[in-house]
Amino acid sequence: MINIVKKDFMASIIVFLVALPLAIGISIACGLPIYSGIVSGIIGGIVVGLFSGNSLQVPGPAAGLILIIVEIIHTMGVEKLFLIIFLVGLLQILFGLMSFGKWFRAISPAIIQGMLAGIGISIFLSQFHIMLDSKPNNDFLLNIKDLLSIIYNSVLPLDGSPHHLACMTGIITIACIIGWKFLPCKKLHAIPSALVGIIVASLLANFMHFNISYIQVGQNFWSNINFISPQDLSNLFNSSVIINALVITFIASAETLLTSTAIDKMSENSKTDYDKEIIAQGIGNSLSGFLGGLPITGVIVRSAAN
């Protein structure tokens, strides 16, 4: 019993150290306060974890939905985003009660992986700009067009800008993440490589006295709670709200169930109840949307660390 508690405690620490920067990073990438990412991570870990159909899955905000969230905020506003996430939760609960989980399993993994890969390329291009200390465009094609110029500015910062310092930090971080897996000491592999990259980048930035823009938390973190009002609920059956909710429901549910399948293959002790898992995700998303959080899905990065 003591050994089980020790293992679970260590796993929870590792998952926390992976999940927290991930939640904060996704919030920032979406242009939302860090509260949104943290509260969705809390709900995913506690609420969804209590009702989950897979004991090893660690739900939380997912990078695969960043572009959709940014587009919704740009076209419909933040208030509609939270209403959409609330509706996503209700739809997932409905689909779970109607035993739709098995139908999501019928979707070819190649389709979902291809869709997520396409989203991943767009995210990579926008975050590549940020890594080189350049502001990304909202347009995917413009990010491609500006790629060579920002690389040139990073290698030869003729205007005296610190692009090369950001570039150096990014390259060292990526090298740490990739190189960590090749260390001869296997015990060190228990520490996630992404966490090592974050620690190294933070130490480097502080040691070199870089001019860092810190995240502004504010004196009262919980003052950022943005409850859905009765006036917001009046837009629940708006066609744009419903369409966007269906899109997020499909992507989030498919990604969650694919992650569950992957976990089942990774562990002999895991067998997912797919309908129960969708209902759990629905409870989490409806609560997250109500409190101003991000959409919650099962993500392999956090779950693999568990």
Where are these regions (language model features)?
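Transmembrane helical cores of multi-pass ion-transport proteins
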Residues: 1-306
